[in-house]
Amino acid sequence: MFKFNAEVRQSQGKGASRRLRHNGQIPAIVYGGSEAPVSIVLNHDDLNNAQVHDAFYTDVITLVIEGKEVAVKAQAMQRHPFKPKLVHIDFKRV
């Protein structure tokens, strides 16, 4: 089972997302269910190391957002065209 710590993202937009990526973080979003969508930030290295396993795409992932555990599945990932980096990820609540 995969478990990641996430922070709620305060700033939005292209410039803010680029600054996050430059600092080794990935912008992401959690949506679905009865709750409102939440923009979050995750550590790039943690996600990049986990996404090489097939189970990352099929198993339930636990995100700890502000101390609250949220069960999600990876819905969509955007990767850099030629660098081995993730650009953005969408999570859907389970």
From Swiss-Prot:
GO terms for biological process: translation. It comes from the Bacteria. Residues 1-20 are annotated as: Disordered. GO terms for molecular function: 5S rRNA binding; structural constituent of ribosome. GO terms for cellular component: cytosolic large ribosomal subunit. Keywords: Ribonucleoprotein, Ribosomal protein, RNA-binding, rRNA-binding. InterPro entries: Rbsml_bL25/Gln-tRNA_synth_N (IPR020056), Ribosomal_bL25/Gln-tRNA_synth (IPR011035), Ribosomal_bL25_short (IPR020055), Ribosomal_L25_dom (IPR029751), Ribosomal_uL5_bac-type (IPR020930). Belongs to the bacterial ribosomal protein bL25 family. PANTHER family: RIBOSOMAL PROTEIN L25/GLN-TRNA SYNTHETASE, ANTI-CODON-BINDING DOMAIN-CONTAINING PROTEIN, RIBOSOMAL PROTEIN L25_GLN-TRNA SYNTHETASE, ANTI-CODON-BINDING DOMAIN-CONTAINING PROTEIN. This is one of the proteins that binds to the 5S RNA in the ribosome where it forms part of the central protuberance. Part of the 50S ribosomal subunit; part of the 5S rRNA/L5/L18/L25 subcomplex. Contacts the 5S rRNA. Binds to the 5S rRNA independently of L5 and L18. This is Large ribosomal subunit protein bL25. It comes from Pasteurella multocida (strain Pm70).
